[in-house]
Design a protein with these regions (language model features):
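Glycine-centered hinge/linker elements that transmit conformational signals in sensory
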Residues: 235-240, 270, 275-319
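Extracytoplasmic "Venus flytrap"/periplasmic binding protein-like
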Residues: 105-182
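Extracytoplasmic/periplasmic substrate-recognition and gating elements
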Residues: 348-418
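Extracytoplasmic/periplasmic solute-binding protein
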Residues: 68, 134-140, 144, 182-205, ...
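Conserved C-terminal helix/tail region of periplasmic/extracytoplasmic solute-binding proteins
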Residues: 388-395, 405-491
Length: 491
């Protein structure tokens, strides 16, 4: 056997030598041509990025930049979490990596501190810090609603006055930031790649893929892509999904529903229709939306989905209560469930059946795009306290942090954690990208009299908005009276 192998090897070597000799001239010619070509090609210089243009003297000699934060989740430090506490958590590690890059670039140390033990009192705590002349904090990262309240209490610098901060850069969220500025000219807070909790606070509809298939319904992804995922199509699916499974004539937690939500659903559906309830005139006076389309939308919701006799709809804060109602979707007895994106991981752990993610529907196909309301208590925004006199320095630091977040926090939070690690299919990944890129800010979304009125409509199933307009307008004017003193509108 060895002799045969040796003979074959000798024959192979002779053949290779023959080929090599016959082709040597061709190889030499090709090599020479390649050398001539490479010699004639000009050397390309590496592409210059924004970070390369940062002035060389933007260094801060080991300064500690302290960020004060507050969210309803006491463990959600998205600014500078302790690495020992986030090791193994892909998002926390990405925040740490972002900070290391920014710290090295600027010669700083980034630190964070919780502003309050109770997230509901953060405005009071910020006021106390400002009145005491506190200068420890370089920036705040707090729920957007509380940041708005801080802005009309004179606690924040207008970001327009920070020359080193450019909110037109790609790493800032342009449309959302314009809405947060009340479509005016004054920015007191900003969102971008630097913070991810606003993405976690985006509203979405979860759907049971197994049940959808079992009912003979098409998964709605293509409808979304084609711009056909509308309120009408959504209601068709809801209508076809409910059933009195035990046949006792009473709908409870043991039966099947088309949609599970709570009384806050109007502040998710209305923004998905592109509707802002609280608006402002060019002089900064608060206005309640009284357009015909707005009233049509309210009527559609109250005569359909919110009708007390409409069995396919289950309100979690209705007679059944949260404890029982919250078993229905995870256990496969509801087609749709409306909530925030941050609930994905919980469903992944609790559900045996596969689920997908969708945006809330458009009102009609003519609506130009989908919108995603986001919870302004959970969703955060960055701002600069009025006691911080180092605006140029702060602007550079926030810009650099946001810039480095593009390749650290964003891919970790969105691509790896939510879109790959948590979501079970690539189609839902596409849906989440759509949600995050189309967040919609509604000032009346949380904490206002308008919010309370919309909750009342949802829980009662009665549209009394028009009849309550006089009292709503009066309260609304009082709530937002200070806006015109801080925000600029018109020309």
């Amino acid at each position: 056997m060895k002799r045969i192998c040796a003979a074959l090897l000798a024959s192979l070597m002779l053949a290779l030598c023959a080929c090599s000799n016959s082709e040597i001239n061709t190889e030499n010619s090709d090599a020479a041509a390649a050398n001539d070509l490479s010699a004639s090609e000009p050397e390309t210089e590496p592409e210059t990025t924004w970070i390369d243009t940062l002035p060389a003297d933007v260094k801060y000699d080991g300064l500690t930049f302290l960020i004060g934060w507050s969210t309803p989740d006491p463990d959600s430090d998205e600014c500078a979490p302790d690495i020992d506490e986030v090791t193994g958590d892909i998002v926390g590690e990405s925040v740490h990596q972002r900070n290391l890059l920014a710290e090295e670039k600027l010669d700083i140390s980034i630190a964070s501190q919780k502003l309050t033990e109770s997230w509901t009192t953060v405005l009071t705590d910020m006021k106390a810090l400002i009145l005491a002349g506190d200068t420890a904090y370089g920036a705040y990262d707090v729920g957007t609603w509380f940041m708005f309240q801080a802005s009309i209490n004179g606690l924040l610098h207008p970001l327009n006055s920070v020359e080193t901060l450019d909110l037109s850069n790609d790493w800032w969220e342009h449309d959302l930031n314009n809405m947060i500025a009340l479509d005016g000219k004054t920015h007191y807070m900003a969102n971008g790649m630097i913070n991810y909790l606003d993405d976690y606070g985006a509203s979405c509809i979860y759907f049971n893929k197994f049940l959808c298939t079992d009912l003979g319904l098409e998964h709605p992804y293509e409808m979304v892509r084609n711009g056909e995922w509308t309120l009408d199509r959504f209601l068709e699916y809801v209508d076809l999904s409910s059933a009195d499974l035990d046949g006792n004539g009473i709908y409870d937690e043991h039966d099947r529903y088309g949609m599970v939500e709570n009384s806050g659903l109007l502040v998710r559906f209305l923004p998905s229709f592109g509707t802002q309830v609280v608006q402002f005139s060019e002089s900064g006076e608060p206005i309640i939306n009284q357009t015909e389309i707005f009233y049509d939308q309210l009527d559609r919701m109250t005569t359909g989905l919110l009708d007390r006799n409409y069995k396919p709809m289950l309100l979690r804060d209705g007679p059944l209560g949260y404890e029982k109602a919250d078993t229905v979707f995870p256990e496969g007895r509801a087609l749709f469930f409306g909530e925030m994106v941050r609930n994905i991981r919980g469903f992944r752990e609790s559900m045996e059946q596969d689920f997908g993610v969708l945006p809330y529907p458009k009102y009609t196909e003519e609506q130009p795009r989908y919108y995603s309301s986001y919870n302004t208590a959970w969703g955060t925004s960055y701002g600069i306290p009025i006691t911080n006199m180092e605006l140029d320095r702060t602007g550079w630091i926030l810009e650099v942090m946001c810039y480095y977040s593009m390749d650290t926090i964003y891919p970790a939070t969105i691509e790896k954690n939510i879109l790959t690690k948590t979501v079970r299919d690539e189609e839902s990944s596409d849906m989440l990208r759509l949600l995050f890129e189309n967040k919609f800010y509604e000032l009346g979304q949380w904490g206002t009299s308008v919010y309370g009125n919309l909750l009342s409509i949802a829980s009662s199933g009665t549209n009394n908005f028009a009849s309550s307009m006089k009292s709503i307008t009066k309260i609304n004017a009082k709530e937002f009276a200070e806006v015109k003193n801080y925000y600029k509108f018109g020309n």
